[in-house]
């Protein structure tokens, strides 16, 4: 009976992030693309400013990396979120499954692991599909800061 209950319980509810396989870890990503938007850091304060400028490798329509398996070859500054460095990424969105599970919170109802597709996530406007712009179209990066500091107003 206990084995049946264990198998009926989704892995993200019965395993810690450290206990997950690499495939389980990867499947937690909802594919919103928020990690793939460029961030700017104030050199004086280390404050991070979020932009709507997409990485060149991000397919804005699908919110997927064009070269995910080889992304570091194409974008040396691309981040790799791991179990070890997760605490360092305080800027992760409040909706991020990695962040939520690390904080002991449940996955949102629109998460692809619960719904079986990304449609609900896109419908809730969690993905960057509706706000992202191509890096090649950007002239002044300050015009694309989403959380503008007072000096940029």
From Swiss-Prot:
Pfam families: CxxCxxCC (PF03692). The lineage of its organism: Bacteria, Pseudomonadati, Pseudomonadota, Gammaproteobacteria, Enterobacterales. NCBIfam families: PRK05170.1-1, PRK05170.1-5, PRK05170.2-1, PRK05170.2-5. Belongs to the UPF0260 family. HAMAP family: UPF0260 (MF_00676). This is UPF0260 protein YcgN.
């Amino acid at each position: 009976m206990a084995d049946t209950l264990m198998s009926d319980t989704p892995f993200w509810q019965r395993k810690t992030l450290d206990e997950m396989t690499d495939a389980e870890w990867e499947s937690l990503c909802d594919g919103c693309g928020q990690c793939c938007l460029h961030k700017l850091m104030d050199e004086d304060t280390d404050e991070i400013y979020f932009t709507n400028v997409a990485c060149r490798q991000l397919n804005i329509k699908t919110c997927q990396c064009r070269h995910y398996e080889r992304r570091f070859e194409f974008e040396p500054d691309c981040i790799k979120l791991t179990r070890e460095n997760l605490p360092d990424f305080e800027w992760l969105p409040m909706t991020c499954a990695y962040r939520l599970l690390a904080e002991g919170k449940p996955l949102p109802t629109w998460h692809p692991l619960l719904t079986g597709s990304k449609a609900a996530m896109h419908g809730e406007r969690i993905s960057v599909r509706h706000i992202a712009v191509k890096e090649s179209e950007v002239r002044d990066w300050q015009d694309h800061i989403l959380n503008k500091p007072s000096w940029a107003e």
